[in-house]
């Protein structure tokens, strides 16, 4: 099954509260002609109108905000990191969710941000530096190989974010079309990564799995796979009514979430190691 949404793209910004108060930034941008609308998050706004690219302002360069979809802000919120947590971000670039986690942790605790691509690792480093993040270790490695080092040294995590590579990333590339083979490849890789993630969790640790794909094979089927394969993991119920103003509904597995257009499509599930 291939689902492609090509409607009008909504634009949002996440205010970096490590550097600036949301209302202060809102006034600065509105004074420049940007029209902002509040969301369910007091530090996120929808950009209704802007006389210039929202990614080319002094405020952006100062690290006062991150342009990203409201959908992509949900996984870090669902993971709900504490200030003293030891966290793994398995597929971290370009850093929107990594820097969001750091913001929620108030730059405390420790985040290990892993990215397989050298090029994307540069973007990750750039965003972490721009946003003033101080609690993050960046690792340029293949998670499928890096896990051997972690397991050998008995390094386990309180919480893990797996925002998995998916066919939704291919859709964003205007020069490519998604094929059934792309979906199958992504699904196999996602199953491998989520299995690794559970291996690296401490007992009672939690993992949030997310994609920007609409395909069942990359979402519910991945969760079904890991729940059937392992007896040391359980699904944690997420409630859709916590995210007001978004077209969000329960997924095809009870307790999972799906975000639908006009918001950026997303799937979110939460697991606990038992």
UniProtKB/Swiss-Prot annotation:
Keywords: Cytoplasm, Methyltransferase, RNA-binding, S-adenosyl-L-methionine, Transferase, tRNA processing
Record-stated family: Belongs to the class I-like SAM-binding methyltransferase superfamily. RsmB/NOP family.
Keyword RNA-binding recorded: yes
InterPro entries reported for this sequence: MeTrfase_RsmB-F_NOP2_cat, MeTrfase_RsmB-F_NOP2_dom, Nop2p, RCMT, RsmB/NOL1/NOP2-like_CS, SAM-dependent_MTases_sf
Catalyzed chemical reaction(s): cytidine(48) in tRNA precursor + S-adenosyl-L-methionine = 5-methylcytidine(48) in tRNA precursor + S-adenosyl-L-homocysteine + H(+); cytidine(40) in tRNA precursor + S-adenosyl-L-methionine = 5-methylcytidine(40) in tRNA precursor + S-adenosyl-L-homocysteine + H(+)
Gene3D superfamilies in the cross-refs: Sun protein, domain 3, Vaccinia Virus protein VP39
One Pfam match: Methyltr_RsmB-F
Protein origin, superkingdom: Archaea
Biological function: Catalyzes AdoMet-dependent formation of m5C in tRNA. Cytidine residue at either position 40 or position 48 is likely to be methylated.
Broadest EC class assigned to this enzyme: transferase
Name of protein: tRNA (cytosine(48)-C(5))-methyltransferase
SUPFAM superfamilies: S-adenosyl-L-methionine-dependent methyltransferases
Record-listed S-adenosyl-L-methionine binding positions: 91-97, 115, 120, 142, 163, 169, 189
């Amino acid at each position: 099954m291939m689902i492609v949404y090509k409607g009008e793209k909504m634009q949002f910004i996440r205010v970096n509260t490590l550097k600036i108060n949301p209302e202060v930034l809102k006034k600065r941008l509105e004074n420049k002609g940007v029209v902002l609308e509040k969301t369910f998050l007091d530090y996120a706004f929808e950009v209704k109108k802007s006389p210039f690219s929202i990614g080319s302002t002094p405020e952006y360069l100062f690290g006062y905000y991150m342009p990203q979809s409201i959908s992509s802000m949900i996984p870090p919120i669902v993971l709900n990191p504490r200030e003293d947590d030891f966290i793994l971000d398995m597929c971290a670039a370009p850093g929107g969710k990594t820097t969001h986690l750091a913001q929620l942790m108030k730059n405390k605790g420790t985040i290990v941000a892993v990215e397989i691509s050298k090029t994307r690792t540069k973007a990750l480093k750039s965003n972490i530096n721009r946003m003033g993040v101080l609690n993050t270790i960046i690792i340029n490695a293949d998670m499928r190989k890096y896990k051997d080092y972690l397991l050998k040294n008995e390094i386990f995590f309180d919480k893990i974010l797996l925002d998995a590579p998916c066919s939704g990333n291919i859709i964003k590339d205007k020069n490519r079309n998604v094929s059934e083979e792309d979906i199958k490849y992504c699904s196999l890789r996602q199953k491998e990564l989520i299995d690794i993630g559970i291996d690296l969790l401490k007992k009672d640790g939690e993992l949030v799995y997310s994609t920007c794909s609409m395909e069942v094979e990359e979402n519910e089927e991945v969760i079904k796979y890991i729940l059937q394969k392992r007896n040391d993991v359980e699904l944690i119920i997420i409630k859709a009514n916590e995210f007001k103003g978004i077209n969000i509904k329960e997924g095809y597995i009870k307790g999972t979430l799906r975000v639908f257009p006009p918001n950026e499509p997303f799937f979110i599930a939460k697991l606990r190691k038992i």
